[in-house]
Amino acid sequence: MERAIFAGGCFWCMVQPFEEQAGILSVRSGYTGGHLPNPSYEQVCAKTTGHTEAVEIIFDPEEISYKELVELYWAQTDPTDAFGQFEDRGDNYRPVIYYTTERQKEIAEQSKANLQASGRFDQPIVTTIEPAEPFYLAEDYHQGFYKKNPKRYAQSSAIRHQFLEENWS
């Protein structure tokens, strides 16, 4: 089993696309990249801890490759927006691919270069690629949010879904 960590704005919106893939064992919402151990949602939202909202994915590389996960990640984000994603603004929503191995770093960097060269976007690809740091699990009510609160999830992700349909379909 391998581990991948992606930050792409609100973690509620990052779970379902990965959970639906074969070879995914778990997708958990949490916080990473900051300086405070075990932060709360309120602390992260106050933008004082340096953390991003992220998802931790445990996957079977025999069924789905890290490269495939990175490609799926891009299709959930606006990789030209360094200051948040869609409705969610601020450093805690910045797009980041956190790598856990040097091989993951190489794959992510090549994928980013390929996306930039593709001409899909007029703006530079600004998603950062950073070494993984401790991942702190978010509170229970955030886990599987799209299943527990489908109406609120739909409302909170409307702008994202419109962008994804226009730019990735």
From Swiss-Prot:
What pairs make up the disulfide bonds?
none
Q: Which InterPro entries match?
A: Met_Sox_Rdtase_MsrA_dom, Met_Sox_Rdtase_MsrA_sf
Reactions catalysed according to its record:
L-methionyl-[protein] + [thioredoxin]-disulfide + H2O = L-methionyl-(S)-S-oxide-[protein] + [thioredoxin]-dithiol; [thioredoxin]-disulfide + L-methionine + H2O = L-methionine (S)-S-oxide + [thioredoxin]-dithiol
Q: Which GO terms describe its biological process?
A: protein modification process
Assigned keywords, A-Z: Oxidoreductase
State the protein's purpose: Has an important function as a repair enzyme for proteins that have been inactivated by oxidation. Catalyzes the reversible oxidation-reduction of methionine sulfoxide in proteins to methionine.
Q: What is this protein called?
A: Peptide methionine sulfoxide reductase MsrA
* Organism annotation: Streptococcus pyogenes serotype M5 (strain Manfredo)
